[in-house]
From Swiss-Prot:
Coiled coil: none annotated. Belongs to the SLX1 family. Residues 34-57, 96-120, 310-339 are annotated as: Disordered. Keywords: DNA damage, DNA recombination, DNA repair, Endonuclease, Hydrolase, Metal-binding, Nuclease, Nucleus, Zinc, Zinc-finger. It is an enzyme of class 3 (hydrolase). It is found in: Nucleus. Its cofactor is a divalent metal cation. A zinc finger (SLX1-type) spans 225-280. The keyword Heme does not apply. It comes from Ajellomyces capsulatus (strain G186AR / H82 / ATCC MYA-2454 / RMSCC 2432). This is Structure-specific endonuclease subunit SLX1.
């Protein structure tokens, strides 16, 4: 679609509400919202500029992020949930029973039998805050949102898991990101910080999805809606593409929404949470489809930046592979036996009958690879292996002639000379 105003931003890649707890005083808790949990946690701990007044006390630092609620499609929705989580009693989304249970209760006195006022749970206690979260996620308003709850601390998860009456809707995912061995770990803050840093808060997971959609819609191929079978107009229609890499199914957004709601039995609602592709029957999540559509139509600059970064990453990877292959090739060539006689050291085995002088001649003959032809003055290269083999071949003879033979004594002519008296 070409009539989308460029001032409208795509759906944020990530936005969450979070729960902080002081590692010094566990009773001190804080609720906030952010698109970048790792950066925000560093601000609260004073490692970066920013933060909040309630978390600025050095007596309470460092803070740890023990739970988050993610899946918000815009900043306004996250701020709305944050306020409702902080002021559940005043929120119109909380159940009436919750408001009544927070009022001061009564109990009978064991001495007089009269009813006396009993103080309720502190509003800022961990069980109270998690109970408020449970109530909001069960409310008719927020239960329709595609929210996920993440827990990074085992003890907080245990408090959450305690019975709270009604159950959550199955569509709300609850994720535990901790191990059972972390309770007494001295590096707890470092472990939690690393877990927060590993959260996927960008569009990197969608870039291949957007590339496939652009290639499919920008081609000259005629495409029909996967639901109503009518011809799609990429310039005017809001089109949703299947998120599975091998599926080319495209549908009108309203057609696909109606298909999902009808299959789930949610007649009368407008926004589904998930469904199955009409073509490949694969599971599709509605927030993922909407993120891709808004990123493709409203975030062209972001798509260009992501594609450029990915190409640079691929080029760096190719260079590393090329350098690694070249280094391995060089090492293999260096490990091969060299044919240069000047650097070659062949093992020379001596025979028991070989004297020291003859052994030296053999070594010099092997070490010399270049000889000069005295007849024509040309240089003749002699392979050391061949020269060595020729001289060792004489070693098989019993009389050890040649280099290994015993020195011959020439008979002088003076032996036959006539003696003159």
């Amino acid at each position: 679609m070409d009539n989308i105003p460029q001032s409208i931003n795509p759906i944020p890649a990530f936005y969450c509400c979070y729960l902080l707890r002081s590692t010094v005083r566990h009773a001190s808790l804080y609720i906030g919202s952010t698109p970048e949990p790792s950066r925000r946690l560093a601000q609260h701990n004073g490692d970066r500029t920013g933060g909040a007044r309630k978390t600025s006390s050095e007596k309470l630092r460092p803070w740890e992020m023990v739970a988050i609620v993610s899946g918000f499609t815009n900043r306004a929705g996250a701020l709305q949930f944050e306020w409702a989580w902080q002021h559940t009693k005043e929120s119109r989304h909380a159940e009436v029973e919750r408001c009544e249970s927070e009022q001061l209760g009564t109990r009978g006195s064991s001495r007089t039998g009269k009813e006396v006022k009993r103080a309720g749970k502190p509003r800022t206690s961990l069980p109270n805050i998690l109970e408020n979260l449970h109530i909001l996620l069960r409310s008719p308003y927020f239960s329709e949102w595609p929210l996920e709850v993440w827990f990074f601390s085992a003890d907080v998860w245990q408090v959450w898991s305690q019975p709270k009456g009604n159950l959550l809707d199955n569509s709300i995912k609850v994720v535990t990101a901790f191990s059972s061995k972390e309770a007494g770990d001295t590096n707890r803050r470092e472990i939690l910080g690393k877990r927060i840093e590993t959260l996927d808060t960008g569009y990197d997971a969608l870039i291949e999805y957007v590339e496939k959609s652009q290639f499919l819609l920008e081609s000259e191929e005629a495409i029909d809606c996967g639901v109503c079978k009518q011809r799609l107009n990429p310039r005017n229609d809001m089109i949703a593409i299947c998120s599975h890499s091998l599926c080319r199914c495209a549908s009108h957004l309203l057609c696909l929404s109606a298909h999902f709601l009808e299959a789930a039995g949610f007649i009368g609602k407008l926004i589904p949470k998930e469904g199955t592709c009409p073509a490949c029957l694969g599971k599709l999540e509605w927030p993922t489809l909407m993120k891709e559509i808004t990123l493709r139509l409203r975030g062209q600059e972001e798509v260009k930046r992501l594609l450029g970064r990915r190409r640079r990453t691929e080029q760096v990877g190719k260079r590393k592979i090329s350098n690694h292959v070249s280094s391995e090739k060089g090492e293999s060539e260096a490990s091969m036996p060299s044919t240069d006689a000047k650097t070659m050291a062949l093992p020379i085995r001596s025979h028991p009958s070989v004297g020291g002088s003859n052994f030296g001649k053999l070594g010099r003959s092997v070490g010399s690879a270049i000889r000069t032809n005295t007849d024509n003055g040309s240089v003749k290269a002699v392979t050391p292996e061949i020269e060595f083999y020729r001289r060792r071949k004489c070693n098989a003879k019993k009389n050890f002639s040649g280099l290994y033979s015993t020195p011959r004594i020439n008979i002088s002519d003076w032996d036959n000379a006539e003696i003159i008296e």
